Amino acid sequence: MSAEKISISLPKELYRELEDFITRKGIPDRSKIFQIALRNYLDENREGTEIIYGIINLVYDHEEASEALTEIQHEYKDNIISTLHLHVNERLCIEAIAVKGEKSKLVELNNRLGQIRGILKARLLISFPYEKT
C-alpha cells in the first residue's frame, strides 16, 4: 500500500498520553493508531446516502426502559438485523443491536433510543461495508 507522509502537532499532555499508551501496549507503529482513529472519525462524520452497517450499543435499566425499547425496535424492524442482550445485574442490561440502513435513519434510531427513560448509554458504532444506493 502506498502512503502519504504528514506531520501533526499535538498538545504536550496528549502527546505524553499517546506515548505512554504506545509503551504500555507495545505498539510498534504509531501511524496505525492515527490511521484507525482517522478512519473512525471519517466514518462517523460521513454524509451521503450510503447503506451502512453498524452496532448500536445500549446500557439501560430494564425496569424503566424495556417497554419503550421494544416499541421503538419494532418501528425500525427493517433496519435491525439482530440483537444480543446481556444481564449485568438485577436491573442493568447491555444490548448490542446490529443495524443496516441509510446513516441518517440509523442516527435517528440511535437518538430515539437514547431519549428513552432508563437508557444510560446509546452509541452507534459504524462498521463496513458501504453500499451505494
UniProtKB/Swiss-Prot annotation:
SUPFAM superfamilies: ACT-like (SSF55021), Ribbon-helix-helix (SSF47598). GO terms for molecular function: DNA binding; DNA-binding transcription factor activity; nickel cation binding. The keyword Endoplasmic reticulum does not apply. Ni(2+) binds at H74, H85, H87, C93. One of its GO terms (biological process) is response to nickel cation. Binds 1 nickel ion per subunit. Its cofactor is Ni(2+). It comes from the Archaea. Transcriptional regulator. Belongs to the transcriptional regulatory CopG/NikR family. This is Putative nickel-responsive regulator. It comes from Saccharolobus islandicus (strain L.S.2.15 / Lassen #1). The lineage of its organism: Archaea, Thermoproteota, Thermoprotei, Sulfolobales, Sulfolobaceae.
